[in-house]
A protein has these predicted regions:
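Catalytic core of DAGKc-family lipid kinases
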Residues: 10, 33, 81-208
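Short beta->alpha linker loops
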Residues: 43-47, 67-70, 98, 155
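ATP/nucleoside-binding phosphotransfer catalytic cores, i.e., glycine-rich phosphate-binding loops
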Residues: 20, 198-199, 204, 228, ...
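Glycine-rich phosphate/pyrophosphate-binding beta-alpha loops
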Residues: 153, 157, 211-222
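Short N-terminal binding/cap micro-motifs at the start of the first secondary-structure element
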Residues: 16-20, 159, 219
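Short amphipathic alpha-helical segments
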Residues: 21-23, 76-79, 105-107, 223-224
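Short glycine/serine/threonine-rich phosphate/pyrophosphate-binding segments
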Residues: 48, 71-75, 129
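ATP/NTP phosphate-donor binding region
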Residues: 1-66, 77, 119
Length: 309
């Protein structure tokens, strides 16, 4: 078994020509700060869960993901498959290195300040955090569940994020990639027939997009925190074209909830009875569309997460 103070570090390459330089900089900071770690590199989504399980089986108590929201999602889903007592001995940390790093940014971890991030992780300050959980039936008729740290998107934003993943290598800039994806999506389907239950409210109308956030949801659930046992929900009805561009402006400015087409909620459970033809994204990555109704809930204080001092 390994030294309990040694990190199990999982590097998830972001892609692009600067990927190696990014890792060299991170490696240099780790050495400068005297971090004792073992390093593995992921090849794809499936390898993340396999490598996390390898770290756990070999007794690592601190697992640090050098990656983004999707890699963190894979990590927590692996942790949720092990015995709760064993999971309680493991702390999860992150050095932001993904296309989308919203959950890391919530805690104040910066993509650019690697020195500060590593110094904070070394302090091993732990906070127990909540996870969201979607329960659904897949195309094979199997009952499934998937956990999330940040959010689930249903509708337009899920489609935009999928397009953004495909275009970020072209545009380089994350903001430019997102805005271009948004504009491209205007020429496609903008709303979806939905039937949703939130608390005592029943929503049965055409909806452009819905975000269920355990975290800030890429700006759509800006008041959500992953430690209050609640989910924040924003439901966006189909705005007029002028309102749509106003919505883009407010989204970029961080004032998304101020838009007249946005309807915010706070709840412990969301029941989606119908979301016809809408894509579903979980922590920034498309998931296989559930067959029939599905439920989204929150599970309190199940992951030990390393936060800044």
């Amino acid at each position: 078994m390994v030294n309990e103070n040694k990190w199990g570090l999982l590097y998830c390459p972001r892609g692009g020509w600067r990927s190696n330089k990014r890792w060299e900089k991170i490696e240099k900071v780790l050495k400068q700060q005297g971090v004792d770690y073992d390093f593995v590199q992921s090849e794809n989504q499936k390898s993340v869960e396999r490598l996390i399980r390898m770290f756990i089986n070999n007794g690592y108590k601190t697992i640090v993901i050098v990656g983004g929201d999707s890699a963190l999602n894979d990590a927590v889903n692996c942790l949720m498959q092990i015995d709760p007592k064993e999971r309680d001995e493991v702390a999860l940390g992150v050095i932001p290195n993904g296309l989308m790093n919203d959950f890391a940014h919530f805690w104040g971890f910066s993509d650019s300040d690697i020195e500060k991030t590593v110094a904070s992780l070394k302090k091993r300050r732990i906070r127990k955090i909540d996870l969201g959980c979607i329960r659904y039936v897949n195309k094979k008729g199997e009952k499934c569940r998937r956990y999330f740290l940040n959010c689930i998107n249903i509708g337009l934003i899920a489609a935009i994020m999928n397009l953004r993943r495909k275009t970020h290598h072209i545009f380089g800039s994350r903001t430019l990639s997102f805005l271009c994806s948004f504009i491209l999506m205007i020429f496609q389907r903008l709303d979806y027939k939905m039937h949703v239950k939130i608390n005592s409210d029943v929503i049965r109308r055409r909806v452009m997009t819905m975000c269920i956030g355990n975290g800030t949801g890429y700006g759509q659930t800006p008041n959500a925190v992953p430690y209050n046992g609640l989910l924040d929900v924003s439901v966006v009805s189909h705005p007029k074209t002028t309102q749509l561009f106003e919505g883009i402006y407010l989204f970029v400015k961080g004032k998304f909830l101020n838009h007249k087409s946005v309807h915010p909620y706070r709840t412990r459970e969301v029941e989606v009875l119908d979301a016809q033809h809408a894509l579903i994204g979980i922590d920034g990555r498309l998931m296989n569309t559930p067959v029939g109704p599905f439920q989204i809930t929150v599970i309190q204080e199940v992951i030990n997460f390393l936060i800044p001092v």
